[in-house]
UniProtKB/Swiss-Prot annotation:
Organism: Clostridium botulinum (strain Alaska E43 / Type E3)
HAMAP family: PS_decarb_PSD_B_type2
Protein name listed in UniProt: Phosphatidylserine decarboxylase proenzyme
Metabolic or biological pathway, per its Swiss-Prot or TrEMBL entry: Phospholipid metabolism; phosphatidylethanolamine biosynthesis; phosphatidylethanolamine from CDP-diacylglycerol: step 2/2
GO CC terms of this entry: plasma membrane
Site (Cleavage (non-hydrolytic)): 255-256
Tree of life domain: Bacteria
Pyruvic acid (Ser) carried by residues: 256
Length: 296
């Protein structure tokens, strides 16, 4: 059972995991683990399924998916019948008013919908993946020079489920630099997998860039792919100023993760998020929601 903290009700909720039985089988049984290593983590598996999700035939899955996971389609720009494929539905745009953004320059917002965990005063060589498992920032981005800038800083992990809105956005106004791509595997980023695969974020396909934000310093942004995520699509234009809340990109089908690293003494994360993170619980958040305040 995966429990997440609802910041509004201040209660814990059980996450309705898409493909839960399959995920538990592939990451918790000997046979499943073997299949994962031989097939599921490979690019060809995710590419093949991704191609299917681009077909018109895959659109037949949409109504059941919406019903099973209680997805609110009233906030989507398109009706269910208007999507050409499952991926078209998966990367759906939302009505702008459905995700209000706090324009106060001192407020740090969530870059997307998902479940958030935050660690402060991070040790660059022992960043927490999940309780008991760690990785290093050097391994994650393969750049020693940039890594040192985030010593004792903040690490924000936003885990997206297949049921979530899968576009990610800029948390402040500023100038985004070019994207660096790192090849890797396609393990699931579900907590079940995170408990089973050491240094999973460093094993998976990922992309990173520096965002020169106007209020929170240079933010290191990392997007991590996962099983069935055929593509991480960056839609922004490098070295051109963007406004807070502007779209940065999106993930095609599958669960996936966005990780932000902020320099020391740039932001104070909201107390409820920090407290839940220390207890091992993720907090459910929406794009545009306040998650921290600038340190003045």
């Amino acid at each position: 059972m995966i429990k997440v903290y609802n910041r509004i009700t201040k209660e814990y909720e059980e996450e309705n995991v898409a493909g839960k039985k399959f995920i538990k089988w592939t990451y918790e049984t000997p046979v499943g683990k073997s299949i994962t290593e031989l097939i599921a983590k490979r690019k060809i598996f995710s590419k093949f399924y991704g191609k299917f999700c681009d077909t018109k035939r895959s659109a037949k899955k949409i109504p059941d998916f919406v019903e099973n996971f209680n997805i609110d389609m009233n906030i989507a720009e398109k009706n269910i019948s208007d999507f050409n494929s499952f991926n078209d539905f998966f990367v759906r745009n939302l009505i702008p008013t459905s995700r209000p953004i706090d324009t106060n320059e001192n407020i740090l917002i969530s870059p997307g919908d998902g479940r958030i965990t935050v660690y402060d005063n991070i040790d660059l060589d022992n960043i927490v993946q999940i309780k008991g498992l760690t990785y290093s920032l050097r391994e994650l981005i393969k750049n020693d020079q940039i890594t040192e800038n985030y010593k004792d800083g903040i690490c924000i992990i936003l885990r997206l489920c297949p049921t979530d809105y899968h576009r990610f956005h800029f948390v402040d106004s500023g100038i985004p630099c070019e994207t660096h791509k790192i090849k890797g595997h396609y393990y699931s980023v579900n907590p079940i997998a995170l408990n089973s695969i050491p240094k999973l974020f460093c094993e998976n396909k990922r992309e990173w860039n520096i965002f020169k934000s106007e209020n929170f310093g240079d933010i290191l942004t990392v997007e991590v792919g996962a099983t069935c995520v055929g593509s991480i699509i960056q839609t922004y234009e490098p070295n051109k100023r963007v406004l807070k809340g502007a779209e940065k990109g999106y993930f095609k089908f599958g669960g996936s993760t966005t990780i932000l690293f902020l320099e020391k003494d740039k932001v104070k994360i909201d107390n409820d998020i920090l407290e839940q993170s220390k207890q091992g619980y993720e907090c459910k958040v929406l794009f545009g929601e306040t998650i921290g305040t600038k340190i003045l």
